[in-house]
A protein has these predicted regions:
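Bacterial Sec-dependent N-terminal signal peptides
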Residues: 1-23
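Function-determining sites in protein domains
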Residues: 20-228
C-alpha cells in the first residue's frame, strides 16, 4: 500500500514538473511571511534591484537553485536608453548579505530595442494566469518579468524552467540575450528586436483566439515550493 501511494505521489510530482502552462504565473508577497525563505527573497531582491528603477519599464530577474542570481533592466536617463544588469558574486541562499558583491554593468541601446522590450512585457504581464498550486520545482531556475502599466502599477509574473519551444520559453531566451548584451556580449540588437516582435505578435494572436483562457485557474500540483 505504501509503495502504491509513493508511486502515485512521484507520478503527480513528475506530471506537475513536466507539464507546461504557457503563461506567466502570479507571485506572492514575500513580505507577509516570516521565514528563512522570505528572508532570502528580501535579501536577494534588495541586492538585485541596486541602482534600478522602482517602477521598471522592462526588468528580468533570474533566481537559479545554485548559481548566482542576476537581473537586467531597460532604463532611460537624460534622453538615452540603457541596459543595466546586476549579477551577484555568489548564490545568496546560504550566504550572508554583507559578503555578497553586486557586479553592475551597463550598455547603451537604441530606442527601438528599449520600446520592443517594454511592449513585449506589457503584453506578457497582461495575461498572468492564476494557479491552483505551483509549477515551481525544487531545483531549476525561476524567471521573473516586471513592468509598469499605464496606471503606475508594477506587474510581475514568474515562470519556472519553461520548455524552450513554448511562448514563455521564447520570452526567457529573448531576455537571456538581453542580459548577455548588457554584459558586453556581441549580440546584434536587430536579432533581439526581431525575436521580440515575432513573439509579441504570437502573444497578441493567442490573445485574440483565446481571450479568456488565462482567466481560468489551472491545477498545477500539490507540491508548492517557495513563496514566489
Amino acid at each position: 500500500m505504501k509503495k502504491t501511494i509513493t508511486t502515485l505521489l512521484l507520478l503527480l510530482l513528475s506530471l506537475r514538473m513536466t507539464g507546461q502552462i504557457d503563461y506567466l504565473e502570479p507571485i506572492k508577497d514575500y513580505s507577509k511571511y516570516k521565514s528563512e525563505l522570505s528572508g532570502y527573497y528580501s535579501n536577494v531582491l534588495s541586492l538585485l534591484s541596486t541602482g534600478l528603477s522602482k517602477k521598471p519599464y522592462a526588468c528580468y530577474a533570474v533566481i537559479p537553485s545554485f548559481s548566482p542570481e542576476y537581473t537586467v533592466s531597460a532604463e532611460t536617463k537624460n534622453g538615452k536608453y540603457y541596459l543595466i544588469s546586476n549579477t551577484l558574486s555568489q548564490n545568496s541562499w546560504q550566504a550572508e548579505k554583507s559578503t555578497i558583491k553586486v557586479n553592475t554593468k551597463s550598455t547603451e541601446i537604441s530606442k527601438t530595442l528599449y520600446q520592443a522590450l517594454g511592449e513585449l512585457l506589457q503584453m506578457a504581464t497582461l495575461q498572468i494566469q492564476d494557479m491552483d498550486g505551483s509549477t515551481t520545482g525544487l531545483d531549476g531556475t525561476t524567471y521573473y518579468f516586471s513592468t509598469t502599466n499605464g496606471k503606475g502599477e508594477v506587474l510581475t509574473g514568474k515562470k519556472w524552467s519553461p520548455d524552450r519551444a513554448t511562448l514563455m520559453g521564447r520570452l526567457v531566451q529573448i531576455y537571456e540575450s538581453v542580459y548577455a548584451l548588457s554584459t558586453g556580449k556581441a549580440i546584434p540588437e536587430s536579432l533581439i528586436i526581431n525575436d521580440a516582435r515575432i513573439l509579441l505578435k504570437d502573444l497578441q494572436e493567442r490573445s485574440k483566439a483565446f481571450p479568456d483562457e488565462y482567466k481560468q485557474p489551472k491545477y498545477a500540483g500539490i507540491f508548492p515550493a517557495g513563496l514566489w
